Amino acid sequence: MSFCLGSQRIMGLIGKNGAGKSTTLKSILNMVSPESGSVKIFQKDFSQYEKECKQRIGVVFGGIDFYPLKKLSVITAVTQKFYTDWDQEQYQKYIKRFALDESKKFKELSNGMKVKYLLALALSHHAELLILDEPTSGLDPVSREELLHIFRQIVKNENCSILFSTHITSDLDKCADDITYIQNGCVLKSAGKDTFLHSFEHLKMPEDTGLLTLEEIMLRTERSEWDDDAAV
């Protein structure tokens, strides 16, 4: 499996459930051990410079409920001790921007506010790479649209790149610069979004006008695999 994310870009990871999106992200972070290969982040071998690299990475996994009974202020006090480049002024800026109440317990936040809080933590140590696993899962359309807008602003204003896995392909239609399609644990295609969309024109039907959406590409690609399996 091989793909590359450039500076100040958003890459979307797509693939059906079980394809390997979350495992890929966990492998990058050394949360699971890959059987072979290597991960380079900031042009350094992650296995050799993990501690240094993690100072420059922010992670947001959807559905995380760590310290659910603790107030945000307490979680922040613990978190900031792990980062040498923690910026309290930056943290307060994002707490205010995201309208977060530090006196609230983590479990009292909505799913959207939980993601915003995790983003605030990540951006407060000036992360240059955000790794997001299904961050918009379970959110209503308005909250999802707001987060996508935030992602675009982060990349533009914070000298940051985003690696973003999701099964909601319409989110990536709106915000991704690059797309990586994972199928059965392998990269089927990884390219800039326009190049990616054009590379699947062979899946178009006579009645189709314009390029296929990411959802249509996934459905037709996976359907083709089902047909191949049925024919065996």
Functional labels for PLM-detected ranges:
Residues 5, 37-48, 52-53:
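Conserved ABC transporter NBD signature motif
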Residues 11-16:
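The feature captures the beta-strand-to-loop junction immediately N-terminal to the Walker
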Residues 19, 141-143:
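Helix N-cap at the start of a conserved alpha-helix in ABC-type nucleotide-binding domains
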Residues 29:
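Helix-to-loop junction immediately C-terminal to a conserved catalytic motif
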Residues 61-117:
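ABC-family P-loop ATPase nucleotide-binding domains
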Residues 130-134:
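Catalytic Walker B motif of ABC-type/P-loop ATPase nucleotide-binding domains
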Residues 145-157:
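Helical segment within the ABC ATPase nucleotide-binding domain
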